[in-house]
Design a protein with these regions (language model features):
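Bacterial N-terminal signal peptides that target proteins for export
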Residues: 1-8
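Bacterial Sec-dependent signal peptides at the C-terminal "C-region" and cleavage site
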Residues: 12, 16-28
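N-terminal substrate-binding region of glycoside hydrolase catalytic domains
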Residues: 24-157, 299-324, 329-333, 337-351
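Well-ordered, non-membrane alpha-helical segments in soluble/globular domains
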Residues: 54-57, 84-94, 158-167, 216-230, ...
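An active-site-proximal structural segment forming one wall of the substrate-binding cleft
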Residues: 94-99, 136-182, 224-231
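Substrate-binding cleft/loops of secretory-pathway carbohydrate-active enzymes
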Residues: 185-202, 212-237, 242-301
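Substrate-binding cleft of secreted/luminal carbohydrate-active enzymes
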Residues: 246-249, 258-371
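Extracellular/luminal regions of secreted and cell-surface proteins that mediate adhesion/ECM remodeling
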Residues: 358-522
C-alpha cells in the first residue's frame, strides 16, 4: 500500500503520548462493482436473443468493467403462455451465476410489443378488450404483422394481469438479489405510451382535444399511468420500482410531471429509454439537448431515488451517425445516472467504446474517495480517541440507500480484531461532484478500541467453573495489546463492508482497506 505519513501534531492523553498520523491515500482508477449502481447487461431486450444469445449462462461479465446487473425484459406472454403456467425458470436459470457472484438482476415485464405478442392469448380469449395495430414500416423499414394491444383498464385484462403479478411478487418482492423492477405494463415496450391509434371513448377523445398525448398527457393517460403505477406498488412494496418518463409523456416539455411527482412521493425511481434514438434537435423543438429529453426530470429524482438510463440499440444507431461517444458520457452527467445500459452485444460494445466506458466508470453512480485520514498511532485499551477523515463523492449520483463508515483493527493473520462504526455519519449525505465542483465532507468519528472488565465476584458460575477445574483469568480482555492495521470500510450499521472504494491496500476481498498502523496498549 502506498501511503504518505505526515506528522500532524502531538496529543497528550492520560500519561500516554499519542502521535496523530495523517495519511493521504492515493485513489485508483479501477471500475467498481457496488450496490444500487453500475452497467446493466441485457440478457433479454424485448427479445429472447438480444443481447445475451452469444453469452454463456455462466458468464457474469466480470470482464466488462463495472457491470453489476443482468437486466431481463420479456413479455407477459413469454412468462405465462397458458393461464397458470408460469415460466420463472427463464429468469432464474440465468440469474443464478450472477447471484453467486454477489451481482444483481433487474426485470421488466411488458404487455405490448411490436416484435411479438405481449399479452397471452388466453387473456383475449377470456374477453379482454384491445385492438390490433401494425407497427409502421417507415419507423423500422420492416413489415411487422399486426400485434394486439390491450385496453389497459379493461377489467378482464387487469384481473388476469394482477393474478400474474401476485405470483411474481410472491417470488421476487423483497428479494435482495433484485436490484430493481421496471413498471412495464403500460404502452409498447412498457414505456408508458399507448399506441397512437389506441381506442378512446368519446369522453377521452374530448379530454385529449387534438393534442399529442406524448407531449401533453390528457386526463385519460394520467389515469392509466396512475392505475398501473399503483398496481405494481400494491404488489411490490419491498422492491425498488422504476417508472419511465413516458408515463408522463415521453416528449412532455414541462419542467416536471404529475406522475413524476407521484413517483418521487412514493419512493419510485426514474428511467429514460432510448438515448440517441431521436432526430437532431432542430427537428424537434421539445428536446432541450441533442440526444435526449428528460434529464431535467431525472435530476429531480437523483437525490433520493436511482436513475436508470438506457441508450438506443448501438449497432443500428452507430451506422446512422446518431451515436456520439462524447454524449455517451455527457448523458451520464446530465441524468446523474446510477445505472446505464449495455444495449448491444457486450463484447463488441466494449471493443467499440472502451475509452468512453472507462471514463464513464469514474463517474457513473457514486464513488467515494478518501482524501485524508488522521488517527492516533498509539491508543490505550478503551481510551476515547477520534479519527478524522475527509471524503469526496466523485460520482454523479447520491448513494440513496445510505451507508455507514467503519474503522477496524486487523491483526497479522488478517483477522478483524475490533470494529468501530460511526453511527452519526451517513454516506447518502455526501453530495456528488457536478460541474467539476467537489463537495468534500470531513467526518470526526469517536472511537474506543478494546474493552476490559474484571470478572465479577461473587458469581455462582465462576465458583462452579473453578471447582470443575476450568481456568480463566480474572480480567476479560477483548482486544489483546499489540500492533494492528487500521482499516476503513463503508457498509452496514453493524460494520459489515458493502461498498468497494477506489483504494489500494484491500485486505483480501473483504472491502476493508488498510490506511495505517495503531499500537494498542493495556
Amino acid at each position: 500500500m502506498k501511503v504518505k505519513l505526515v506528522l500532524a501534531g502531538v496529543v497528550i492523553a492520560t500519561a500516554l503520548t499519542t502521535i496523530a498520523c495523517s495519511v493521504r491515500p492515493a485513489s485508483t482508477d479501477e471500475a467498481l462493482i457496488n450496490p444500487d449502481m453500475g452497467w446493466c447487461f441485457y440478457k433479454y431486450s424485448n427479445r429472447a436473443w438480444a443481447y445475451g444469445i452469444n453469452t454463456p449462462t455462466e458468464d457474469t461479465l466480470d470482464w466488462f468493467p463495472g457491470c453489476s446487473t443482468m437486466y431481463m425484459r420479456l413479455t407477459w406472454n413469454d412468462l405465462e403462455p397458458e393461464e397458470g403456467d408460469l415460466r420463472w425458470e427463464i429468469f432464474d436459470t440465468y440469474a443464478q451465476p450472477w447471484i453467486a457472484k454477489g451481482k444483481k438482476v433487474a426485470i421488466r415485464v411488458m404487455t405490448c410489443s411490436q416484435v411479438e405478442e405481449g399479452t397471452p392469448e388466453f387473456v383475449r380469449m377470456a374477453g379482454a378488450k384491445g385492438h390490433w395495430f401494425t407497427y409502421p414500416k417507415k419507423t423500422s423499414g420492416l413489415d411487422f404483422p399486426p400485434r394486439w394491444e390491450p385496453v389497459y383498464d379493461d377489467p378482464i385484462f387487469l384481473a388476469k394481469f394482477e393474478n400474474f403479478l401476485k405470483a411474481m411478487a410472491a417470488r421476487y418482492d423483497g428479494d435482495p438479489n433484485v436490484a430493481f423492477i421496471d413498471i412495464g405494463s403500460l404502452g409498447i415496450y412498457g414505456e408508458g405510451n399507448p399506441r397512437p391509434d389506441y381506442p378512446l371513448s368519446d369522453e377521452e377523445r374530448a379530454e385529449q382535444g387534438g393534442r399529442n398525448p406524448d407531449c401533453y398527457p390528457p386526463a385519460w393517460k394520467t389515469r392509466l399511468s396512475k392505475l398501473h403505477i399503483d398496481l405494481w406498488r400494491r404488489h411490490f412494496p419491498r422492491t425498488q420500482l422504476i417508472c419511465l418518463d413516458g408515463f408522463d409523456g415521453g416528449w412532455n416539455p414541462e419542467p416536471d410531471g404529475e406522475m413524476m411527482r407521484y413517483c418521487r412521493a412514493n419512493g419510485i425511481g426514474f428511467r429514460d429509454d432510448s438515448i440517441f434514438t431521436f432526430p437532431p434537435p432542430e427537428k424537434n423543438k421539445f428536446r432541450p439537448y441533442d440526444s435526449w429529453c428528460h434529464d431535467n426530470w431525472a435530476r429531480l429524482f437523483a437525490p433520493t431515488q436511482p436513475v436508470v438510463v438506457e441508450t438506443c440499440h448501438y449497432p443500428y444507431r452507430a451506422r446512422t451517425g446518431q451515436w456520439d461517444n462524447e454524449k455517451y458520457l455527457k448523458c451520464v452527467e446530465k441524468y446523474q445516472a446510477s445505472y446505464l445500459s449495455i444495449h448491444d452485444f457486450p463484447k463488441e460494445h466494449l471493443e467499440s467504446c472502451r475509452a468512453t466506458i472507462d471514463k464513464i466508470n469514474k463517474r457513473l453512480g457514486y464513488r467515494f474517495e478518501l482524501r485524508e485520514v488522521t488517527y492516533p498511532d498509539t491508543v490505550k485499551t478503551g481510551e476515547k480517541v477520534e479519527i478524522v477523515s475527509t471524503w469526496v463523492n466523485v460520482g454523479v449520483a447520491w448513494q440513496v440507500k445510505g451507508a455507514a463508515l467503519a474503522w477496524s483493527l486487523v491483526d497479522a493473520k488478517g483477522n478483524v480484531a475490533w470494529t468501530m462504526v460511526d453511527n452519526r455519519f451517513d454516506f447518502k449525505t455526501l453530495d456528488p461532484t457536478l460541474d467539476d465542483v467537489e463537495r468534500p465532507q470531513t467526518v470526526k468519528t469517536p472511537c474506543r478500541f478494546g474493552f476490559t472488565k474484571k470478572v465479577s465476584e461473587p458469581d455462582n458460575v465462576v465458583v462452579w467453573a473453578r471447582e470443575a477445574g476450568r481456568k480463566f483469568p480474572d480480567t476479560v480482555v477483548m482486544l489483546k495489546p499489540g500492533a494492528y492495521t487500521l482499516c476503513v470500510s463503508v457498509g452496514s450499521r453493524q460494520g459489515t463492508p458493502a461498498i468497494a472504494l477506489p483504494l489500494e491496500g484491500q485486505v483480501g476481498q473483504t472491502r476493508r482497506y488498510a490506511v495505517g498502523r495503531i499500537e494498542i496498549q493495556p
